[in-house]
Amino acid sequence: MASASYHISNLLEKMTSSDKDFRFMATNDLMTELQKDSIKLDDDSERKVVKMILKLLEDKNGEVQNLAVKCLGPLVSKVKEYQVETIVDTLCTNMLSDKEQLRDISSIGLKTVIGELPPASSGSALAANVCKKITGRLTSAIAKQEDVSVQLEALDIMADMLSRQGGLLVNFHPSILSCLLPQLTSPRLAVRKRTIIALGHLVMSCGNIVFIELIEHLLAELSKNDSMSTTRTYIQCIAAISRQAGHRIGEYLEKIIPLVVKFCNIDDDELREYCIQAFESFVRRCPKEVYPHVSTIINICLKYLTYDPNYNYDDEDEDENAMDADGADDDDQGSDDEYSDDDDMSWKVRRAAAKCLDAVVSTRHEMLPEFYKTVSPALIARFKEREENVKADVFHAYLSLLKQTRPVQSWLCDPDAMEQGETPLTMLQSQVPNIVKALHKQMKEKSVKTRQCCFNMLTELVNVLPGALTQHIPVLVPGIIFSLNDKSSSSNLKIDALSCLYVILCNHSPQVFHPHVQALVSPVVICVGDPFYKITSEALLVTQQLVKVIRPLEQPSSFDAAPYIKDLFTCTIKRLKAADIDQEVKERAISCMGQIICSLGDNLGSDLTNTLQIFLERLKNEITRLTTVKALTLIAGSPLKIDLRPILGEGVPILASFLRKNQRALKLGTLSALDILIKNYSDSLTAEMIDAVLDELPPLISESDMHVSQMAISFLTTLAKVYPSSLSKISGSILDELIGLVRSPLLQGGALSAMLEFFQALVLTGTSCLGYMYLLRMLTGPVYAQSTALTHKQSYYSIAKCVAALTRACPKEGPAVVGQFIQDVKNSRSTDSIRLLALLSLGEVGHHIDLSGQVELKSVILEAFSSPSEEVKSAASYALGSISVGNLPEYLPFVLQEITSQPKRQYLLLHSLKEIISSASVAGLKPYVENIWCLLLKHSECAEEGTRNVVAECLGKLTLIDPETLLPRLKGYLAAGMLIVYFL
């Protein structure tokens, strides 16, 4: 501490030097010291430092002054409270100084101190005391109105303090309000504006009494309407209060809105602007309370959206009656912008109206159909707006309308309107021609901002309504090309144009673009070569989509792609070969070339082999390998059967090595690539290549990542079907991992389905060491060995499903295996685990294979209903239901009879019935619906709640089989108050 005090003493001494550079360096060093957490100042050092910093605020050199102010921030947190109060007192006194520079620097100092105080929520005594000390001085400075500059600074600091520490000043709020209200009528507009800001921060923390006083004062003054100037101020103030505390002003809207509506009719553009801004604030901040007035607000906004008394649009409307694909004469398009009138404020009114409509559209989702009837046509008509800033807000409002439409495509539709075909989407569809008519001419305007708005609009429109522009492509393509070719276009405009073109290409039929391919290819190719990487990246995306357009592989096409292949290939290969380019461009060049080879590979000749070698190099690069894997997957899946033999020998081992990388996306992508290679190129793959892949598979088959496991199992299934000889080597670690996964309680859904498909494919290969009985023993062995490996019930279900899958693939083995399972259930020496597996396996096998030939099956399962084990009883119930699905005429009447005649087994039998209803086909079950329905109704009043719940589930599922007949019945029971309805 002593050394720190000595160092600071030296700095303080240098600060008194007559050399400004010495003072500057010493102050800078002091600030560095104060910023250290370790610094501790004794009382004497604190006093000296504070005194010196305050003295330096009056330094003749501005740079020294600025540094001294910066020192105040860290200093406040390092000195004791009374020193902070000394700083604040001095700064407040200096604020009233005659010297303007000292006033300014002291104001900045006060803001710095306030900014460093702990937040109000911390309950800091220092913050409370400092704020109270400042508040009294500020209110008197504001109230005096002697010097406007002092007043403005005081208002600024007051607003800052209220926003940060308003909660600490509750006792001062009445006096703050009293000093602020008179300033709303100040002759200086700057004072009024800062007063409004301060009041906005005040209402965030003031009590109800102060808030009510403020609102009632504003309402009273508005009612008087003494002068237009003050009325404008009061409207602005109400809007500011609404923005900061909308939840509090909501209850006063019934009084406020009629006044604001009245002032809208006064011939004062500035007042109208503020009124509409207030409406916008109410709409955003008081959505519930403003609801009754939304229609009024919309009508006012629609009225003033077209308010342009000094300009006549009639001539322009006549010019727009016909849409020309080649656009209007460029020389005429700047004529609107040449009109200027410095006194014309009407554009601000129109802009406020557009912003308010934007707010209404963004917050009133339930009014979408109404918006498309009234707001949408009005906004479309104003796309011709002459003032660029207003036009941008009109476009933004319509964009908001489109964005609100996208998520409500399936809900928020009036059923009556739907019957008439009047959903928001159909209404938008009918307005597309008007939108295009309004936009197409503006896509060639000189204004970059306007053209960007057009592209954003078209992009959103196509996202909301794919295919909407099918009839209008001839009109729009010239506008897109214009921006791509125009030398005055900014980079952002080109990016927006390319992005728009990409979305349009993706969401329309390729045939729509065939007449325009020649015009589109050249500018897109030029953009691929652009030096700015973002333009190149976006252009490569468009190129990739253009390739799909000129040669659509999904459908036959007569379009001749040959003239364009060279240009598209050349521009892409140049980017693919470049090493010193942005990562995004590298990846998109790979993807684009992948699409070119996939769609046009049969036209590339000798270039194909060279390009595939580049892909091989990119596959070896850690940065580009994932994108290359995806591109190769695309190529391998091409119906053109691209010759990949030149790279498979080196490429497949590289792909195999990716399976051990700790990058999940790379593993998944590689498994997809290998799967498609096995399917389409099995004759080009050697046993060594496949062995290299198989060696990497065991770690991937794990419950830690079920999706990777599923992909690995799907790959093995493909291998079993296409290259069965390769599976002779999987009986070791791979099969062990697969069997281990079958026993996992997490195996379900897609992974379980993949596993079942694999076992069926595996047993059908006829591999000698992987026959039916061997696999069956592998699956069921742990259960019969009474191993502790199976601890979860789900494991038994998974094993049973695998057993059934094997049996379906080898139906000749079925009778013997089913007979063995029946004996296992009957055998008194069988453990509960064996019985559980046997019953579940019988159920799964019987679900797909008719077991009615097994004479004792029914009695064996019914006997299992009496087992002391709840799990065995549940499995027996499931088995009976599942077996019944395999032969409904044989088993369903039996189950229904048992439900009636065996009350003790009723609960389990009803669960069997639920399984039948859930799993059987609708066609198979329909003849029995009435019998089942009547039976269920008889048991709906059962005394046991568990039984009633199962009956209710059965009734609900049964209703879905024949809803037209059964749903009205359920409604009838609901109306009659029948008990069963409460359990549905």
Language-model features, listed with the residues they occupy:
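Amphipathic alpha-helical scaffolding segments
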Residues: 29, 296-300, 373-379, 396-402, ...
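Alpha-helical solenoid scaffolds in large eukaryotic transport, assembly, and signaling factors
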Residues: 2-3, 13-67, 71-84, 114, ...
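Acidic, serine/threonine- and proline-enriched intrinsically disordered linkers and terminal tails
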Residues: 295-348, 355, 405-427
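Core helices of alpha-solenoid repeat scaffolds
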Residues: 3-9, 42-51, 80-91, 123-139, ...
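Short coil/turn segments at helix-helix junctions and helix-capping linkers
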Residues: 10-24, 52-66, 82, 90-105, ...
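Hydrophobic residues within the alpha-helices of tandem HEAT/HEAT-like
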Residues: 15, 29-35, 71-78, 94-95, ...
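Short, polar/flexible loop-turn hinges at active-site or ligand-entry regions and domain interfaces
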Residues: 120-123, 554
